[in-house]
């Protein structure tokens, strides 16, 4: 029996080999007790403030909205130590691992940001670190691979399947099945088997909590909508969590449309997938007609995932959040626009959310509205990818 509800409506659950059930139950028990332990909370808050650099800024875009009546704010998770929102929850999970007496961390990574965050947390807290990463992602995210190794992590290339994030997830789970007595699996997003979606949400919810306090201070009211990109969905659920019970605030999640939904080369299972069982949970996913997991695609490695966190599936099913999609080209345009107009280079993942916000502004420039985009990470890791694309197009 679980202590916390493992489901969000019909989505979620704990679909894992029996051998892993005790490890997940131990994790749930440790999390529940840690949430009630003032010492644990004080240690977590201290790391967030003095190591990671929280609270992060809420920045008004001075130039992007000129000539319109929109106020566009960016929640600056790109300013966090490690370069993205991933640092928040790995610090929490690393403290949990120590609490459970674990000595090793297993992690998976796509863009490399969760890998970097896992590596820095392990270096700080004296834990061994093994990171599984698709061989294709290792090629396109070489700066982050070097960062991980520099901080003492072992990076293990995964050549099976599509050599991307879903395959790294499978290998990490396989490793954990044989090592769970000494190792903690530090899952990088708000997906997977219970209790991970709940743990990751709670260790990311300060994004929305800070945003709410900051926007009330700056504007005296809540925003009309908050936007975030959605791969597995951790940065988005971190932003949404504190606004779910605010009915006047729109929640907009932005999935990757890749080369276009009609091409099949995308990563948008919420709107264009079917419900199934994958990665230990019941959630929408990209499937072939005979039920096999289909390969996802996105220019951004961190969104290149064929499923999505179960709470997003639930919010979509009850109509509380809207989920849209943005193509590679639209994300690239937003990447360039923010860089040129505001002097902020966003991650390609975050550029998807920004692109949709810019679409909303362009569609009705005279609408008075306040929008907040969760700028989930910085774009340093993507400059070589973008450089090669722009060079091939003759744009540079």
From Swiss-Prot:
The modification N6-(pyridoxal phosphate)lysine is found at residue 86. Its cofactor is pyridoxal 5'-phosphate. GO terms for cellular component: cytoplasm. GO terms for molecular function: tryptophan synthase activity. Keywords: Amino-acid biosynthesis, Aromatic amino acid biosynthesis, Lyase, Pyridoxal phosphate, Tryptophan biosynthesis. Gene3D superfamilies: 3.40.50.1100. The keyword Amino-acid biosynthesis applies. Pathway: Amino-acid biosynthesis; L-tryptophan biosynthesis; L-tryptophan from chorismate: step 5/5. InterPro entries: Trp_synth_b_CS, Trp_synth_beta, Trp_synth_beta/beta-like, TrpB-like_PALP, TrpB-like_PALP_sf. GO terms for biological process: L-tryptophan biosynthetic process. Pfam families: PALP (PF00291). Its EC number is 4.2.1.20. It catalyses: (1S,2R)-1-C-(indol-3-yl)glycerol 3-phosphate + L-serine = D-glyceraldehyde 3-phosphate + L-tryptophan + H2O. Belongs to the TrpB family. The beta subunit is responsible for the synthesis of L-tryptophan from indole and L-serine. Tetramer of two alpha and two beta chains. This is Tryptophan synthase beta chain. It comes from Yersinia pestis.
């Amino acid at each position: 029996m679980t202590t916390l509800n493992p489901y969000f409506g019909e989505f979620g659950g704990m679909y894992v080999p029996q051998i892993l059930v005790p490890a997940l139950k131990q994790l749930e028990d440790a999390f529940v007790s840690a949430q009630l332990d003032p010492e644990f909370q004080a240690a977590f808050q201290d790391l967030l403030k003095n190591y990671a650099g929280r609270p992060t800024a809420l920045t008004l875009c001075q130039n992007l909205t000129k000539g319109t009546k929109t106020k566009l704010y960016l929640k600056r998770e790109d300013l966090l130590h490690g370069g993205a929102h991933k640092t928040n929850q790995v610090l929490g999970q690393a403290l949990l691992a120590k609490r459970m007496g674990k000595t090793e961390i297993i992690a998976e990574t796509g863009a490399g940001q969760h890998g970097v965050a896992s590596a820095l947390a392990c270096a700080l807290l004296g834990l061994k670190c093994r990171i599984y990463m698709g061989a294709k992602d290792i090629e396109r995210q070489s700066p982050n691979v070097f960062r991980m190794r520099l901080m003492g992590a072992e990076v293990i290339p995964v050549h099976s399947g599509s050599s991307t994030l879903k395959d790294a997830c499978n290998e990490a789970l396989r490793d954990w099945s044989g090592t769970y007595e000494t190792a903690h699996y530090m899952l990088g997003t708000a997906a997977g088997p219970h209790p991970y979606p709940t743990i990751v949400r709670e260790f990311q919810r300060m994004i929305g909590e800070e945003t709410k306090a900051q926007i009330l201070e700056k504007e005296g009211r809540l925003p009309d909508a908050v936007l975030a990109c959605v791969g597995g969905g951790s940065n988005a659920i971190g932003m949404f969590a504190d606004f779910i019970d605010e009915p006047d605030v729109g929640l907009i999640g932005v999935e990757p449309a890749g080369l276009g939904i009609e091409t099949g080369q995308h990563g948008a299972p919420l709107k264009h997938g079917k419900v199934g069982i994958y990665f230990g949970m019941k959630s929408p996913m990209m499937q072939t007609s005979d039920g096999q997991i289909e390969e996802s695609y996105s220019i951004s490695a961190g969104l290149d995932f064929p499923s999505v966190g179960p709470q997003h599936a639930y919010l979509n099913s009850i109509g509380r959040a809207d989920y849209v999609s943005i193509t590679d080209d639209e994300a690239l345009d937003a990447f360039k626009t923010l860089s040129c107009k505001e002097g902020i280079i966003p991650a390609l993942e975050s550029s998807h959310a920004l692109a949709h916000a810019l679409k909303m502004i362009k569609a009705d420039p005279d609408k008075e509205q306040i929008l907040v985009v969760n700028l989930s990470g910085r774009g340093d890791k993507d400059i070589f990818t973008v450089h090669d694309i722009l060079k091939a197009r003759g744009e540079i």
